[in-house]
Amino acid sequence: MKRTYQPSKLVRKRRHGFRARMSTKGGRKVIAGRRAQGRKRLSA
């Protein structure tokens, strides 16, 4: 059986990266929430 997680740096950045987050209203909300919480890493 093939495993579900097949790591790819490119896909990770495109789907969960900072620019991907900033491109939608909901994504900006995620970044704002993580900033408010004081996260060291805001996105992938």
From Swiss-Prot:
GO function term, MF aspect, one:
structural constituent of ribosome
- InterPro entries to which the protein is assigned, alphabetical: Ribosomal_bL34, Ribosomal_bL34_CS
Listed GO cellular component terms? Answer: ribonucleoprotein complex; ribosome
Which UniProt keywords are given for this protein, alphabetically ordered?
Ribonucleoprotein, Ribosomal protein
* Gene3D superfamilies from the UniProt entry: 1.10.287.3980
Signal sequence, renumbered to the chain: none
Note the superkingdom of the native organism. Answer: Bacteria
Segments carrying the region annotation (Disordered) are 1-44
Gene Ontology biological process terms, A to Z: translation
Q: Residue ranges under compositional bias (Basic residues)?
A: 10-19, 26-44
For whether the record's keyword set contains Ribosomal protein, the answer is yes
- Pfam short name (any one): Ribosomal_L34
The record's similarity note reads: Belongs to the bacterial ribosomal protein bL34 family.
For this protein, the record's NCBIfam families field holds:
rpmH_bact
- List the protein's name: Large ribosomal subunit protein bL34
Q: Name the gene.
A: rpmH
